Amino acid sequence: MNDLSTMSSLTKEEILQLIEEATALKKGKQELGLAGEFVANLFFEPSTRTRFSFEVAEKKLGMNVLSLDAASTSVQKGETLYDTVKTLESIGVKACVIRDSTDEYYNELIGKVGIPIINAGDGCGQHPTQSLLDLMTIYEEFGGFEGLTISIHGDIKHSRVARSNAEVLSRLGATVLFSGPASFQDEQNPHGTYVQVDEAIKQSDVVMLLRIQHERHTEKMGNEDYLSTYGLTVNRAKNMKERAIIMHPAPVNRGVEIDDSLVESKQSRIFKQMENGVYVRMAVLKRAFQNSKLHQKGRESVYVVSH
């Protein structure tokens, strides 16, 4: 079965195939092979982009979408995630896309349930579909990754986006730079080099900003102090390369990690990332569903969980 737990679980060839498929779908390729199949979305963490992006992707594929309120499920009664997935498998759901607040939650599922598991974000761990949409956005801009310099700024320590992107970008031939407060640094991440914010911005083809995850911090820095010291200000943006682009996984804290006027500037690709997310998730769902059919005959459904 083709689970999607981390970016490292995908080969370079598989990554490029997913980008190619997502690009074709964005250009209007019709895909009705999943029409009528059931997909269930279950979210245990607040989500706007991931949740609704998956729902739009599913509906574009012609699927029947079941959106479940996490507060009304038996998880609130103490049911394990494993038993929840097995229950859904038993009633005809054939794949799961899961977000859970626990790091590497998928280890209790992969190889133990009979349907593919797609990770939509695990704690401070990984966020592979976000990484894929970021890669698609970069690929659209530059036609590849080899030789590019991508700087990732902000809360590296708590960011599953940083963790996923740093690994895969390094593997695809890009140079990864990190920048941010010392308390946000992740010394366990071997895929980037820490440099001072101004130097990182000057060197970068892609300036990727991260949200401060206030919910994971006990001490908070003032918004204006953070922007002036570590964020992308108007003055810093003037030192970007002419063709450099600005990216952010969102939600964006305007005036904190990025000056408000830059969010929708000429160099920003923030909303294009969101657009690309729909097509990437269509490609991911199609891949999981089709590859699952290699192991299980008959019609199948897809289940999306976010915890």
UniProtKB/Swiss-Prot annotation:
Gene3D superfamilies: Aspartate/ornithine carbamoyltransferase (3.40.50.1370). One of its GO terms (biological process) is 'de novo' UMP biosynthetic process. Coiled coil: none annotated. It catalyses: carbamoyl phosphate + L-aspartate = N-carbamoyl-L-aspartate + phosphate + H(+). It holds the Pfam family OTCace. One of its GO terms (molecular function) is amino acid binding. L-aspartate binds at residues 77, 160, 211. One of its GO terms (cellular component) is cytosol. Pathway: Pyrimidine metabolism; UMP biosynthesis via de novo pathway; (S)-dihydroorotate from bicarbonate: step 2/3. It comes from the Bacteria. Its EC number is 2.1.3.2. Carbamoyl phosphate binds at residues 49-50, 99, 127, 130, 250-251. Keywords: Pyrimidine biosynthesis, Transferase. Catalyzes the condensation of carbamoyl phosphate and aspartate to form carbamoyl aspartate and inorganic phosphate, the committed step in the de novo pyrimidine nucleotide biosynthesis pathway. Belongs to the aspartate/ornithine carbamoyltransferase superfamily. ATCase family. Heterododecamer (2C3:3R2) of six catalytic PyrB chains organized as two trimers (C3), and six regulatory PyrI chains organized as three dimers (R2). This is Aspartate carbamoyltransferase catalytic subunit. It comes from Bacillus pumilus (strain SAFR-032). The gene is pyrB.
